[in-house]
Amino acid sequence: MQTCQFTGCDALELVDMDSDYILGQVVSRQMILILISGTEMKILLKIHFNDSEGNSLRRKKFPDQPTDAQLVTAKTVDYMKELTNQVSGRICRIFQLNNLSLGMCIPLNMHGFYELYTDYTAEDGMLKKFGQAWKIKGDFGSLVCTAYVEIMEPAAVTHLQYTEEQKTDDDELEFL
């Protein structure tokens, strides 16, 4: 999984959500959200994390960072924003390979309780909407990821195919 090189983790595991989980449920103290959109579709991607998990994940990639509590929190949020940005960029590249041009906004940090205000109601009319949640586990703990997808032009996404991208040396996580 290419995400391992962004996180510094040896192995990441995709695990099922708890059986009592409901989309829109608050699962962590913080979340980073980013909007990926184009004329055909929109994806609202969120990575939910607690400070301890985010900090543990950040320290795997950058072990020599300072330990001042306020600075650690800021660095952790910055790291999680960049991780969300990298994942979203990867999603945009996959859609670009399928001739769908999507752009993305700047990642936004919010408190996890704002998840309560998200409407994950599925619709199957002219505008197709659905939500999905998954959990990624590693030696840092776990992250919950949620996505809410709105498809405005269903015909444009019926041909989508995913092929694994070739690994290159320049896929390293960069903080600008």
What are these regions (language model features)?
Residues 1-176:
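Composition-driven recognition of glycine/serine/threonine/acidic- and proline-rich low-complexity segments
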